[in-house]
Amino acid sequence: LIIVDEEHDQSYKQDEGIIYNARDMAIARASFENIPINLITAVPSIETYENIKKGKYSVSKLNQRYQDAAFPNCEIINLNNTKLEKQTWLSKETIEKANEHLKKNNQVLFFLNRRGFSPHVLCKKCFSSYNCPNCSINLVYHKKKETLLCHYCGFKSSLNRDCSKEGECDFIFSGPGVERISEEVKKNFPNKKVEIFSSDTMNKKNSSDTLNKIINNEIEILVGTQLISKGFHFPNLNCIIVVDIDLTTQGHDLRAAEKSLQLYHQLSGRAGRTGKPATVYFQTYSKNTKIISEITNSNPDIFLDRELEIRKKNKLPPFQRFISLILTGENEQKLEKDAFYFKTFLEDKINARVLGPVSAPIFRLKRKFRIRLLIRGSKSLKLQNSISELIAKYKFSNGIKLTVDVDPINFN
């Protein structure tokens, strides 16, 4: 027997070196060995759900929580109906909801999946901003460490306050991270013990002490990233506030809504675990509250059924195969030329659409430029084998590397 827990989790996808999905490898191994495999999840991946719908997989459901605890209620807080004060991200309604729970001795979690203090730093006098010298991305300001950090290559820099125009820089910190939300929470609840729960704070030696304090309700308010959704049991946590649901539901990733569904169901599962009434609040500026209502509904099948219809209509995975081809190199012009030549080479020889080439959303990563091609075709080994044979024959320019990602999960 093979058991794959949290089968939907993106961490099963190895996206460096040899690229593969460990869940799919486990399914293949079970098939080769003719042994059963159990895929366990609160919200299945869209591929698994489609296999359930067409009867390829059988399904067993647990329709009750442990000890018959009720599922948390979900409420949407529409920020279009309120005016936030300058440089704040929590509405008065949100603060009032949190205060109601704190009065009942409930723990409160403010959730924002963004590390650090601010994702973008700009001087409003000289207009200089801090970007990573190795990647085409902003450096994130970590206030506690007084450090600017690239979350992709690890580059670190200090905040230079000397202005190229005159005197000292007058910084604008654009957008919040968990450190900034923590400061705002402390201003609103000065007498409460507040703790940040992220990979920056929980990988230290004292993390077990922090966990014990949370369990014993010595920490009343948590400000956390996605790390907090990973299977922790906090008996007093009965209020979760998602600071910005728009951050995860929008963007260039076709799986953004699916990933949000999985994340927020996992996150909601942290609340109300001991039977007390619990609520998850979602702050949003989006006027399309239908999609948010589906994502936050306790029945994930509502969203998954609609998502499958959209994917089928538009011939998107799991109804077609995507194969991502990422070309990387230090010479931008040579890379662009190779990408166009390679596309022409492929188009003449395979029975599939080749989209691109386009610059990757993160165009430069670890000092190398990145260009993407995307192959859309039938789900067949014949297509994969023919692409593999063509790649083996093709001669790229010196310094150009090709990475092949079958069934990509991320499109960065």
State where each predicted segment sits.
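A structural preference for short, hydrophobic beta-strand core positions in alpha/beta folds
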Residues: 39, 194-197, 354-357, 404-406
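Short amphipathic beta-strand starts and helix->beta connectors
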Residues: 303-313, 348-361
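A common structural junction motif
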Residues: 343-352, 390-400
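Short proline/glycine- and acidic-rich turn/helix-capping motifs at secondary-structure junctions
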Residues: 356-366, 402-412
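Short, charged interaction patches at domain edges and termini
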Residues: 374-386, 409-411
